[in-house]
């Protein structure tokens, strides 16, 4: 199968490495110099060092080449940008002959508060077969060929089947869903909760506290998702509890590292600079807080993280305030 991946960051590169073993894959990046260097060295030293690019993988900065590669037949076009980069990429695709579009990003667009599928529809319309590939997956492990499971969510059944045929393989299991909203909400909010978990762990508050936070965080994800039209069962799957557990507990999680740094008293700007890569939870926290307020949904953990990130609230005082909240029933509707 012909596959073009637009975006040569860590996740785009990792997926390209995995898929190039079985498919004809083009990996596109914006920088001509960077892509030429990757083609010469057969490695993405900037985002995924130590993982050689397969000889069959074509690395290019030629946008037309990447699109022409999938224009005919059963081609698959994958957007491997951040949420912030999705709209500019979709605008580049306007008027182009593309068969479909699947994105990997997780979050809400800053400013508009839109989910990725809403951004794509706004720019490219509703007729294009489109969907999101998500789930618990660190790029480094995918590049190593370690096992993982993902979910493709799309309204178009043929696109779901195409993505399963393309991505499902010896080390990657792919499940399918038509709940695009649920999969996207799970992928967005779990990043915020990973920051919260990093704060707790950085304050050495113990495993009991971590488990409680993850559990009540899942209730927040579900509450928001249902309000936006998602199905509750989606959050019991890979894009919900699966991605939440990995991002909150895995040492490779950038969002968790943000929380650890905040607990140590580091300024957010310093933490982001040290990471060197995108931590979507930082970008997403304000947007989710605003959306929850508009929908009148209680999301106390999300609000607490946004307060620490943007309002100068103390992590320790914030934790104390969360613990001091009035007891209530344990349910999705309760906060």
From Swiss-Prot:
GO terms for molecular function: glycerol-3-phosphate dehydrogenase [NAD(P)+] activity; NAD binding. Its EC number is 1.1.1.94. It comes from the Bacteria. One of its GO terms (biological process) is phospholipid biosynthetic process. The keyword Lipid biosynthesis applies. It catalyses: sn-glycerol 3-phosphate + NAD(+) = dihydroxyacetone phosphate + NADH + H(+); sn-glycerol 3-phosphate + NADP(+) = dihydroxyacetone phosphate + NADPH + H(+). Pfam families: NAD_Gly3P_dh_C, NAD_Gly3P_dh_N. NADPH binds at residues 11, 30, 106, 139, 254, 278, 280. Keywords: Cytoplasm, Lipid biosynthesis, Lipid metabolism, NAD, NADP, Nucleotide-binding, Oxidoreductase, Phospholipid biosynthesis, Phospholipid metabolism. It is found in: Cytoplasm. Pathway: Membrane lipid metabolism; glycerophospholipid metabolism. Sn-glycerol 3-phosphate binds at residues 106, 135, 137, 190, 243, 253-255. It is an enzyme of class 1 (oxidoreductase). NCBIfam families: PRK00094.1-2, PRK00094.1-4. PANTHER family: GLYCEROL-3-PHOSPHATE DEHYDROGENASE, GLYCEROL-3-PHOSPHATE DEHYDROGENASE [NAD(+)] 2, CHLOROPLASTIC. Belongs to the NAD-dependent glycerol-3-phosphate dehydrogenase family. Catalyzes the reduction of the glycolytic intermediate dihydroxyacetone phosphate (DHAP) to sn-glycerol 3-phosphate (G3P), the key precursor for phospholipid synthesis. HAMAP family: NAD_Glyc3P_dehydrog. This is Glycerol-3-phosphate dehydrogenase [NAD(P)+]. It comes from Paucimonas lemoignei (Pseudomonas lemoignei).
């Amino acid at each position: 199968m012909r596959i073009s991946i637009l975006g040569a960051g860590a996740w785009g590169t990792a997926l390209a490495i995995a898929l190039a073993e079985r498919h004809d894959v083009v990996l596109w990046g914006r920088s001509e110099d960077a892509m030429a260097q990757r083609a010469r060295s057969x490695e993405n030293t900037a985002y995924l060092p130590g993982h050689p690019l397969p000889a069959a993988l074509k690395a290019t900065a030629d946008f037309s080449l990447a699109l022409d590669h999938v224009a005919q037949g059963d081609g698959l076009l994958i957007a491997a940008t951040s949420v912030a980069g999705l709209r500019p990429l979709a605008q580049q695709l306007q008027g182009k002959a593309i068969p479909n579009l699947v994105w990997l990003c997780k979050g809400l667009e800053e400013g508009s508060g839109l989910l990725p599928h809403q951004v794509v529809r706004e720019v490219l319309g509703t007729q294009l077969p489109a969907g999101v590939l998500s789930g618990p997956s660190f790029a480094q492990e995918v590049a190593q060929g370690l096992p993982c499971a993902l979910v493709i969510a799309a309204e178009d059944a043929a696109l779901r089947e195409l993505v399963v045929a393309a991505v499902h393989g010896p080390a990657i299991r792919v499940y399918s869903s038509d709940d695009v909203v649920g999969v996207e909400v799970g992928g967005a909010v779990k990043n915020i909760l990973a920051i919260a978990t990093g704060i707790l762990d950085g304050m050495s508050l113990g495993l009991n506290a971590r488990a409680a936070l993850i559990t009540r965080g899942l209730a927040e994800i579900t509450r928001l998702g249902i309000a936006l039209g998602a199905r509750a069962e989606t959050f019991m799957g890979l894009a919900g509890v699966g991605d939440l557990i990995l991002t909150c507990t895995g040492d490779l999680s950038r969002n968790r590292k943000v929380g650890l740094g905040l607990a140590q008293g580091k300024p957010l700007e310093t933490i982001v600079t040290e990471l060197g890569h995108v931590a979507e939870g930082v970008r997403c926290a304000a947007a989710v807080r605003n959306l929850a307020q508009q929908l009148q949904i209680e999301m106390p953990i999300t609000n607490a993280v946004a307060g620490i990130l943007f309002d100068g609230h103390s992590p320790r005082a914030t934790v104390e305030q969360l613990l001091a909240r009035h007891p209530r029933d344990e349910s999705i509707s309760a906060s």
